[in-house]
Amino acid sequence: QQDQQAGPNRPVQFGASVETVLIDLMVADADGNFVHGLTAEEFRVFEEGKEMEITFFAVEKFAAEDTVIGNPEVDAAPSLNRYIVIYVDGINTTPQDWLRVRPHLREWVADGLQPNDYVLLASLHPDGRMRMTPEFTRDSKIVVDALMKVEGNRDLSFRIARQERELAQAMGLESFMGVGDEAADAARLRQGAQLSRIFANQRRSEVRFGLDYLLGLADHLGLTFQVAGPKIVIMVSGGLPEIPGLNFRLMVDEEASDASPHVRQLAGLSSFQPLIPERGSDELAQFDLLHAIGRFNRDNYVFYTIDARALGGGSSGDARYGFQPNLSSMSQGAVNSNEQQGLLRIAGATGGLAFYNTSNFKAAFARVQQDTAFRYVLGYSLPTHDPKDIADHKFFRVKVEATVPGLKIRAREGYVDTGS
């Protein structure tokens, strides 16, 4: 097995003997270039609004050995091993979307990796099976061969379109335009609201299953390989909705908004408010996502998410699959955006980047290489947290500021303290 050390003198982070909270930083100028030569005195770090004393500071180099930036000290420093997890979310990605990304990913693995890159491929298949290569490897052929066996979810778009049609039929949207029977209208609206919750809960379970798998993968890698430094995760997905099932709920919302107050009262929706008044109101799904992010940050994972749907699209029904819901342009835009929000959130909160609304996947992989070439690392002593907060999986928010004006800092937003 190859040397798994990611850098000298890194303190213990969230191990059995917890000592230090480590924060990896990407610090860039206005043009997006990494800023070298900074010191610990030029940063401030806060946890839950309280300033923490910086007790550890380092610069880590993951660029290729022959990279020259003009800083003698950095140029002479050895390159650390860079550990990359390629994760393909086969539950939320259709075969068409996966085949759109796969050639570019295959080319990057075959030709674009550096000598100090170690890669592991993990994938969650539509039937719930997980597959992964045995270890982090520099043998690109092993990873490429495994990539060719990854599958997308053939049922996803068909099932959602089928459910949207069923919901439309339950509310009479395909054949009923309103004939003044308020009791019948209320019954249809009530049935639609109930059905939308059933479909939304199914979608939430699906999304949660994918998040649980990712957490299990992180735990497995942590126990098996003991990589001390940051782990880069390139996550390919057809969407990770922040509010699972938003498309179903908005179908009911729009129908309810057109109903009279009396019909809404008969349907049990007497004072109409959208079932989803604003993004982020689905607290259960939000907790799932925030808890997952906190765990990833605890274990030092940085996510770069790739939206495989390329230029737009969503998990809402599609005319190709026999049905497309008659949503307003505003609601359809909210549905499409919702599918991206989980990917945006997981990348931003772990200090990485999200790539979406683009078919230029080759450029995305090149940007990941560039973005992970150098990192600042700062640390502070783990505060004593309330046991109740630990038991409740509280997300402890962290913010890093620079005292030098004009710098852009990207860092993880917080972590979950497991108390171990």
Task: Provide a role label for each language-model segment.
Residues 1-420:
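Scaffold/interface architecture of coatomer-like assemblies
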